[in-house]
C-alpha cells in the first residue's frame, strides 16, 4: 500500500528497537509477527522489512513488495561488468532484513545505528514508498544547509 507521508520523532529503546509510527503501520502491507526467529534472510516473510544504509548517513526502510521492484533491477546487473558488480556488492553490503514485532517495533543493529549516527532519538520521514530514518541533528543540518537548493530543485521539478 505505502504512501508514507510526514515525519515523527521516536526513540530507540535500550534493546535497540524502534517503534514504527502507528500512522505508517496502518499503511503497511507487512503483518507484524513475533514468531519470526531471525532478523536475517528474507524480509518477504510476515513482518519483515528491508533496511538499507544510505551514503548520505540515513537509513531507509522498505516493505518487501517495494524492495522486490528494486531487486528486479539489481539482479539484471552483470557480474562481468566491474561497475555493475561493484554496485551490487555495495548495495547488498548495506542491506539487512529486520522483523517487526506485534508492538510495531524493529530491532536495528549497532552497525546500522552507528552509520546513521543514531544513539537514541530518531526522526522517521515518510517518503511515499519508503521511510527514511535520520539522527535529528543530521536531518536538521541537511535541511538547513540545503534550503536555497530546495528552492531551485522545487522550481525545476514542480
Swiss-Prot record:
Listed PROSITE patterns: SPOVT_ABRB
Principal localisation: cytoplasm
Highest taxon of source: Bacteria
SUPFAM superfamilies documented for this protein: AbrB/MazE/MraZ-like
Keywords carried by this UniProt record: Cytoplasm, DNA-binding, Repeat, Transcription, Transcription regulation
Cited CDD domains: MraZ_C (cd16321), MraZ_N (cd16320)
GO molecular function: DNA-binding transcription factor activity; transcription cis-regulatory region binding
Domain SpoVT-AbrB positions: 7-66, 95-138
CC per GO annotation: cytoplasm; nucleoid
Keyword Nucleotide-binding: no
Compartments (UniProt record): Cytoplasm, Nucleoid
GO biological process, one term: negative regulation of DNA-templated transcription initiation
Pfam families (alphabetical): MraZ
Family: Belongs to the MraZ family.
Record text on subunit structure and interactions: Forms oligomers.
Protein name: Transcriptional regulator MraZ
Amino acid at each position: 500500500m505505502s504512501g508514507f507521508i510526514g515525519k515523527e520523532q521516536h526513540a530507540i529503546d535500550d534493546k535497540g528497537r524502534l517503534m514504527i509510527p502507528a500512522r505508517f503501520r496502518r499503511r503497511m502491507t507487512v503483518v507484524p509477527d513475533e514468531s519470526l526467529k531471525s532478523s536475517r534472510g528474507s524480509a518477504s516473510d510476515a513482518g519483515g522489512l528491508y533496511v538499507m544504509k544510505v551514503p548520505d548517513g540515513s537509513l531507509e526502510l522498505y516493505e518487501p513488495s517495494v524492495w522486490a521492484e528494486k531487486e528486479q533491477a539489481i539482479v539484471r546487473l552483470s557480474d562481468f561488468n566491474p561497475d555493475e558488480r561493484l554496485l551490487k556488492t555495495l548495495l547488498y553490503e548495506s542491506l539487512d532484513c529486520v522483523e517487526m514485532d506485534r508492538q510495531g517495533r524493529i530491532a536495528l543493529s549497532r552497525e546500522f545505528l552507528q552509520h546513521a549516527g543514531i544513539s537514541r532519538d530518531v526522526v522517521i520521514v515518510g517518503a511515499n514508498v519508503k521511510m527514511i530514518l535520520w539522527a535529528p541533528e543530521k536531518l536538521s543540518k541537511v535541511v538547513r544547509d540545503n534550503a536555497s537548493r530546495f528552492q531551485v530543485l522545487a522550481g525545476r521539478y514542480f
